[in-house]
Structure formats: structure tokens, C-alpha cells
């Protein structure tokens, strides 16, 4: 059975003030309200089979933000005469079909789509499968220094004829299809990592003795990885005893955390956990609504232990200085 591949692009409006909404008890910030959808159905050689284009009339951000108008060329009249957003989104998802695999240039649009579906009381569980076509492109054409990854820059670099405007949803989607026809799209999609594989690659980047990699999916609370014992409590990779984490957690990058744990049974022994075990986490909110938490243990060596002690000492000093400053301001 042929795959139902949908390339899509969204244009969305934003407000002059942030808008938050309640998602299953958790406040989330609205990324933007969709005002235009462009989509094409393609086969695995990126031949266009069907197209979809629609302007939507927003309900929340009704006034067109000036920056959005400048980038997209949309006018307030375009928004005002658009199809009501609930009706338009329902029609788009019906056109896609329940088995659709979505693809976009980047990973910005699916979270926006899912938030909009939820706020319109539509099923936000779809899509369940989607691809970042930038990653498929980079598999064949590794990025060189100074090269941009915007759709326009890649279209220029690949010599695709520029016969349509950019920042028009359907036009951008057709350009994406043009680029895909210059790739081995079948191989790129076949090699595309699952979310778990991508999290493993991110969490276990450097060489080391990593163990017990696990991913926990579907959480709406960002800090559930610290609060839920199922996620926060980890067994010792050597003996199975629950590890005891240090009071200090260090942040690495935007969404990675780690600490040095001790095993009550192994500490001081000659086995791999005798000097402690690093407990590592990588957080991801790929769909814009739910958090996934990747966790693993890393057995330390002399170099990583020395680096931990140095960074831990620096963190304690920052905490001490902050506490003294707050006390002085009272």
C-alpha cells in the first residue's frame, strides 16, 4: 500500500500580548493562530499528487500583527474573509486522511497545528508520524560553513527555478517538493530516526559507558522527570539498588540535566558503580503539547568525575552568591 505523504506549510498570526491556555491542567503559551495552510500529497519520489490551500479566519488573534503582515504579504482583509478556522482545520485534516504521514521544512509547524487543533476542539493526536525534511536534506548534503538552511537559501543552492513567491504556504510547500525530487527521498525517510532514536543520539553523544536508556512519553508537566518516582528513581546498573542523587543538578544545553548518584550497596567497591553513577536526562516537547523524558546511566571515568567536581563547585558558588545578594536586598 503506498504511503500517504503530506508536505505542508503554515502561516500563523501572533498577538501583541502572550496568550496562554489550559492543557489538561497545565498552562501553555500559544505559539500562534493559523491563518493559512498550503499542502501537497506526494509519492515517495516527491511527485505531486494533489494540492490543498486555504486562508483561515482566526478567533483569538484577530488583528494581523504587523511583522506577520510584512513577512507573509497577508492583509487584514485576507484574514477577515478567510474560512472560519474550526471549519477550515476540520476540512484540512479530512483531506489529509487518518493515515497521513506529515513532512515539513523544519519542525515548527506540527506543534502549532496540534495546539490549534486542541483549541478548536478537534483531535490533536494527529499527526502521529512526521518528518523534518531539513534532516533528510542534510543526510545527502551536509551543511558547509556559512550555508543557510532557510527554504529559500536551499532552493537557490540547489538551482531550483524560482517561479513562485516565498512565504506563501502553498508556494513554499511546492518548493519543498521541488527540493525533495532532487533527493533520494525513499532512503531518507527509511533512515529517519524515531523520536527515541533521536533522543538517544542527543543524550549519549560523547563516547562513554551508557546503560539502561529509557524514554518516558506523554507528560504535560515539564518537571515530571523530577517529581514522578517512576522517572526520577533509577536502579543501579550494577546491583539494582535505587541510586541516591546528589543535591546539585547541572544543566547541559537547553533541555539536558545530570547529576552524580551514589549506590548504597556499591559505593567504595571495585565495580563500575564504586565511584558513583551519572544519571542523565534529555527533555523534548516535539509535538508542542507533551513532554518526553529520555533517561540513562553513565558510568564515570576519572576525567568526567573531575569535570563534575569542577562544575559542581562553580554551581554551589553561584548559588551562594545569589543567596547573599537576595539577603542583602531584604
Regions found by a protein language model. Give the residues of each.
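Conserved non-catalytic scaffold segment of RNase H-like nuclease domains
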Residues: 2-111, 272-314
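Metal-dependent phosphoesterase core characteristic of DEDDh/y 3'-5' exonuclease domains
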Residues: 31-37, 41-72, 93-219, 283-287
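Acidic two-metal-ion nuclease catalytic site recognized across multiple nuclease folds
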Residues: 182-330
